[in-house]
A protein has these predicted regions:
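Short, basic/aromatic beta-hairpin or loop at an interaction surface
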Residues: 76-86, 124-139
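A short, polar/proline- and glycine-enriched secondary-structure boundary/capping micro-motif
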Residues: 122-126, 168-169
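Extended, hydrophobic interaction surfaces within ordered domains
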Residues: 131, 146-149
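Short alpha-helix capping/helix-loop boundary micro-motifs
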Residues: 89-91, 139-146
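Electropositive, beta-rich accessory/interaction domains or terminal extensions
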Residues: 2, 6-110, 115-118, 149, ...
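Short secondary-structure transition/capping segments
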Residues: 130-134, 159-164
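Short, well-structured beta-strand-loop connectors
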Residues: 150-155
Length: 186
């Protein structure tokens, strides 16, 4: 049984990839999948032409296809980008990645996980439709350490597993998420 679990984990890790890249011109809205078009990721900034790019600790965001499937199980008609994630993924357990984990996207892009989850100060349309929103609990964020070009279908590789800390993230941002998690409000 242990060997089966190991093989399954190995298979999933070897299949880890970006299934969709999504951008938006402004914050607070769903992002639009860009299809197969290669996208430029700028160092210490994020996805070119995306509203969330900038000099802060949440330059890019990730959400697993499994999270979208759970939302669909709740009766929502959602797809890639609908939770405003930049990268929709499969084959990698995003919630198992501690802060500081470094991910290689494609051949060149290097991202460090800077925040797990987020506090929603204003409830989004999805929350009002379903009474819940998965992204605050299941979305993760990163800062871009090395830029480059990525496309849907590119591999995701864990380059270095983090130790649970990230120097790019303000302590108050982490404290806010942790307080909400403990209070059960994420």
């Amino acid at each position: 049984l242990l060997l089966e679990r190991y093989l399954l984990a190995f298979e999933e890790a070897s299949m880890a990839c970006i299934t969709s890249i999504n951008i938006s011109a402004r914050k607070g809205v769903r992002k639009t999948p860009v299809g197969d078009a290669p996208q430029v990721v700028l160092v210490d900034d994020g996805l070119e032409n995306d509203a969330h790019a900038g000099k802060w600790h949440r330059q890019v965001s990730f959400l697993a296809e499994a999270s979208l499937a759970r939302a669909r199980d709740m009766g929502l008609e959602v797809g890639p980008g609908d939770f405003a994630e930049n990268f929709t993924t499969k084959g990698i357990d995003l919630l198992d990645l501690p802060l500081g984990t470094q991910l290689r996207l494609g051949k060149d892009v290097l991202v460090e996980i800077s925040q797990i989850g987020k506090v929603c100060h204003t409830r989004c349309a999805i929350y009002h439709l379903a009474g819940d929103c998965l992204f605050p609990r299941e979305g993760i964020f990163g800062v871009v350490l090395h830029g480059g070009v990525v496309s849907a279908g590119d591999a995701i590789e864990v380059v270095r597993r983090g130790d649970g800390t990230c120097t790019h993230t303000p302590p108050e941002a982490l404290a806010e998420v942790e307080a909400a998690r403990k209070a059960g409000t994420l």
